[in-house]
Amino acid sequence: MTSKKFDFTEYSHRRYNPLTDSYVLCSPHRAKRPWQGAKEEIKKDDTVKYDPTCYLCPGNIRATGFENPKYETTYVFPNDYPAVRVDQPDYMQDESEITKGNTLKTRMFKTEGVKGKCFVICFCPNHNLTLPLMSAEAICNVVETWKHLYVTLKKESLEGPIRYKYLQIFENKGSAMGCSNPHPHGQAWCLDVIPSVVAQEMCNMTKYFELNNSHLLGDYVKLEMLEKERIVVENDSFIVVVPYWALWPFETLLIAKEHLKSLEEFEEKQKVDLASALKMLTTKYDNLFNTSFPYSMGLHQAPLYGSNEEVENSWFHMHFYPPLLRSATVKKFCVGFEMLGEPQRDLTSEQAAARLQELDGQKHYKNLL
C-alpha cells in the first residue's frame, strides 16, 4: 500500500465503456517512449477538382462500365461490388446434418444468410474536397442524403419482400484506413440483420434504461456537459467529446443533446447543426498534424425495424476512430495485448481532448498557408 496520490496522467488504470460493457487499459506513462516502429507515408493531397481516371468523379466510367452522371451535389449509387446482395437464395440448414443428430456441429458451427444492399455516397463532385474543406451547406446535403436513405429504406423494409433491420452509414478516410479511392465518399450498408457491434450497444442501452429508467447516452451527455473537460465541439443540438473510455488516441463521440432516435427525426435545425459540428471536428482533426487526417467514422441510430424497446432506447450518435498517435506519420496499432487481452491506449482522454480543444475549428490549415 502507498499513501501517494493516484495521478491519472502518470499511472496505469482501466476505464469502463458502458456501450460495449468492456474495459480499456490506459497507460499514460508510455506516451514518453521513443518510437522506432513503422511510419505512414505522407501522400500529397489531391489538388485537382476533377480526375479523369477516378471512378467516382462526375461523368467518368466506373470499373463495371457504368457511367456516372455529371452530378453537382451529393450523389448516391448502388455499390458495384457490394458486400451483401438481395439476389441470393435463402440459407437453409442441411437436412442431412439435422437427421444425423450432429448436435455438436450445429451447436458450434452456426450460420445465418444475410441479404441487403450497399451504396456509395459521393459527398460532392469535387475530387479534392474532404468534409473539412466543404462548405457547411454542402455537408448539409450529405446529411440530407443520409436521412433520405434511412427513410426510404425503412419504408422499403416495412412494405417490401425483405425486412431490412439496420442501415450502417460510414466513411473510411485515407489510405491508412484502407480507403481504395481518394475521392471524398462514404458508404451505406443495409442489412436484414443487426450488426454485432450495434446489437451490443443496443443491448447495453436497453439494460441501462431498465436499471436506471433513463437513457445511457442522455445521462452521459449531462455528465460531459457538467464536467466540460472532454468536450471538443458543441452547438445547440450536439456535443463532440473524447469519450472517457476512448481507445484510439484522438477518438471522438458525437452525441445528440436531446433524445433523437434516428435521422428520421431530424428537422432542419438538427441537419444544419450536425453539418456544422462535422465541419468543425474534421477541421480540428486536419489542423492537429497539418495533414488530411485519416479515420473511420460511422453513425449509430435506431434500427430500420426492431422492437419498441430497441427503437425507444436508441440515441443518435457517431463514432470517429482516427489512428494517428504522435504525428502525421505515426499511427496506433491494435496488436499483441490489445488483440489477446484488452484494448489499451497511451495518453488519457483528457490529454487528447485538451489538444483538440486548443485547435481552430473554423480555419483550415490549408487556408492559412
Swiss-Prot record:
Keywords: Carbohydrate metabolism, Galactose metabolism, Iron, Metal-binding, Nucleotidyltransferase, Transferase, Zinc
Binding-site positions, UDP-alpha-D-glucose: A63, N79, D80, N172, Q187, K332, F333, C334, V335, F337, E338
Catalytic activity as recorded in UniProt: alpha-D-galactose 1-phosphate + UDP-alpha-D-glucose = alpha-D-glucose 1-phosphate + UDP-alpha-D-galactose
Keyword presence, Transferase: yes
Superkingdom as given in the UniProt entry: Eukaryota
GO molecular function: UDP-glucose:hexose-1-phosphate uridylyltransferase activity; zinc ion binding
Chain sites annotated for binding Fe cation: E201, H300, H317, H319
Group of enzyme by EC: transferase
Family to which the UniProt record says this protein belongs: Belongs to the galactose-1-phosphate uridylyltransferase type 1 family.
Protein name: Galactose-1-phosphate uridylyltransferase
Organism: Schizosaccharomyces pombe (strain 972 / ATCC 24843)
